[in-house]
């Protein structure tokens, strides 16, 4: 009787970190793996200006080619002259374009011997013979066709639209994804609250600007025109003030027929447009709030609740912001106010 063959023992290198069962057949692979736990990258790139590091020499060598631009791996196909930076990239290319064993979908048109790995690739190719795109829209009355399924799927949304899923009672259907996102932002965004005064705002940007009014020290932008003492919390509001009050520019005109009104700010035009749209007027929730002038809105300084009515009236009469004069020193068109 012949001797029994001894079983082949494969040495495994096991990760010693708790809750990690990774194991490898080579020691260098384990060392590279351990770097994921420790965060070490012992193989830094020595190219000037490149601060990348790698867990193994193999990865560093592969990266170094990006600096030299060398392409030492030629395609295995005799009919192809393409070269690649890595062997892996060359193999991917070969399997995709030259490995006929993987191409099971053959074109049956006379004189064409092309084959493809995927059925949809064959259908796209057949367009060159039939001049008919393979993926037709199933919607009744629509005769559009597309070359790939993804384009058809995107087109079908034109018919189905984008129904709102934020609220079961909301019947909105957006014709485009952009209109859907705009609807969600305007109608379903949860309001954000100021921690100090409990005032709520529709958008985080509004809250961020509002919080500046609570700071002990804040930068305000003063109007540089002689005789004008107005100041604003943002540079944009200062520019809007100068355009509307000093230069009398109102670039946002209402496009509704027989309405010649124009506004200095886009938001003012949007608020005004509701007047011409009965549907929007029905949907718009009415919440009691004091009337404020453009100057008051731009300044970012809201009068106390008890004095809101008198302040609003004074603003309308005088055309100026009702506020206490700030103390501070002017620096480059701005003031640092201490409360």
Swiss-Prot record:
Tissue expression per record: Synthesized in oocytes and, in much lower levels, in somatic cells.
Predominant cellular place of this UniProt entry's protein: nucleus
Listed Basic and acidic residues bias regions: 275-288, 305-316
GO MF, one example: zinc ion binding
Cell compartments where the protein resides: Nucleus
Keyword Mitochondrion belongs to the record: no
InterPro entries, alphabetized: TFIIIA_Zfn-C2H2, Zinc_finger_trans_reg, Znf_C2H2_sf, Znf_C2H2_type
Region of interest (Disordered), residue spans: 275-339
Zinc finger residue ranges, C2H2-type: 13-37, 43-67, 73-98, 105-129, 135-159, 162-188, 192-214, 221-246, 252-276
GO annotation, cellular component aspect: nucleus
Gene Ontology BP terms: ribosomal large subunit biogenesis
Keywords linked to the UniProt accession: DNA-binding, Metal-binding, Nucleus, Repeat, Ribosome biogenesis, RNA-binding, Transcription, Transcription regulation, Zinc, Zinc-finger
Summary of the function given for this chain in its UniProt record: Involved in ribosomal large subunit biogenesis. Interacts with the internal control region (ICR) of approximately 50 bases within the 5S RNA genes, is required for correct transcription of these genes by RNA polymerase III. Also binds the transcribed 5S RNA's.
Protein's name in the database: Transcription factor IIIA
Organism of this sequence: Xenopus borealis (Kenyan clawed frog)
Species lineage: Eukaryota, Metazoa, Chordata, Craniata, Vertebrata
GN (gene name): gtf3a
């Amino acid at each position: 009787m012949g001797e029994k063959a001894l079983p082949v023992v494969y040495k495994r290198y096991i990760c010693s970190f708790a809750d990690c069962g990774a194991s490898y057949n080579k020691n260098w692979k384990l060392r590279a793996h351990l770097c994921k736990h420790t965060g070490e990258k012992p193989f830094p790139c020595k190219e000037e200006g490149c601060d990348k590091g790698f867990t193994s020499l193999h990865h560093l060598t592969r990266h170094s080619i990006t600096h030299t631009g060398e392409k030492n791996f030629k395609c295995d196909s005799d009919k192809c002259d393409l070269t690649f930076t890595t062997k892996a990239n060359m193999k991917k290319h070969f399997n995709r374009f030259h490995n006929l064993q993987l191409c099971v979908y053959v074109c049956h048109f006379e004189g064409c011997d092309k084959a493809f790995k995927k059925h949809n690739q064959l259908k796209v190719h057949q367009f060159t013979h039939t001049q008919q795109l393979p993926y037709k829209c199933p919607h009744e009355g629509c005769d559009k066709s597309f070359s790939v399924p993804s384009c058809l799927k995107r087109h079908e949304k034109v018919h189905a639209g984008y129904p709102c899923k934020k609220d079961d009672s909301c019947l909105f259907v957006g014709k485009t994804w952009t209109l859907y996102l705009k609807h969600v932002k305007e109608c379903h965004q949860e309001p954000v609250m100021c921690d100090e005064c409990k005032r709520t705002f529709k958008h985080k940007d509004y809250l961020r600007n509002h919080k500046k009014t609570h700071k002990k020290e804040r930068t305000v932008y003063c109007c540089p025109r002689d005789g004008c003492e107005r100041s604003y919390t943002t540079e944009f509001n200062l520019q809007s003030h100068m355009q509307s009050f000093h230069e009398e520019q109102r670039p946002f005109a209402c496009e509704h027929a027989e309405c010649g009104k124009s506004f200095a700010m886009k938001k003012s035009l949007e608020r005004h447009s509701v007047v011409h749209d009965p549907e929007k007027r029905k949907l718009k929730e009415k919440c009691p709030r004091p009337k404020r002038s453009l100057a008051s809105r731009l300044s970012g300084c809201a009068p106390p609740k008890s004095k809101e009515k008198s302040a609003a009236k004074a603003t309308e009469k005088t055309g100026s912001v009702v506020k206490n004069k700030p103390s501070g020193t002017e620096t480059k068109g701005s003031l640092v106010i201490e409360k």
